[in-house]
Amino acid sequence: LRRRQRQMCIRDRSLLAFQSEDGRWYQVVNRGDDPANWLENSCSCLYVAALCKAIRKGLLDASYLEYARKGYEGVIRSLTWEDDDLIIGNVCIGTGVGDYDHYIHRPVSANDLHGVGAFLLMCEECEQVF
């Protein structure tokens, strides 16, 4: 049942409707219109990885590649360099249950392991379908 629910969520393009012009998704996905909300890289990486994996496994058709590529490019554009170090910024530190205000005021980090792991997973999945 869970697999079918995940497929339906992606196939009905509900998540894709909230993809920003930049290609990434907001910390609170459905509130991109609020200036206090911000584009978050770890969730964006995981959404792109999920799209690519679903395409690779035949669960989604190739028309979804444009959304995956747009998300990938949005994340890549957001990266910075400090000397020889790649910086993955805009990563929410930790999670927890809270209201909207709680989520948009979560600490933001660079190179937090949640973000680095999600970035590596995204790159691996993208490499297999791009």
State where each predicted segment sits:
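Single conserved hydrophobic/aromatic residue that forms the stacking wall/gate
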Residues: L1-I10
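Short, surface-exposed loop/turn motifs that are enriched in glycine and acidic residues
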Residues: R4, D33-S44
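Conserved active-site loop region of the serine DD-peptidase/beta-lactamase
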Residues: R11-D12, K70
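Conserved ATP-utilizing enzyme core subdomain
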Residues: S14-L16
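C-terminal ends of transmembrane alpha-helices
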Residues: F18-G23
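Short linear capping/connector segments at secondary-structure termini
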Residues: Y26-D33
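CBM-like carbohydrate-recognition segments
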Residues: L39, C43, V48-F130
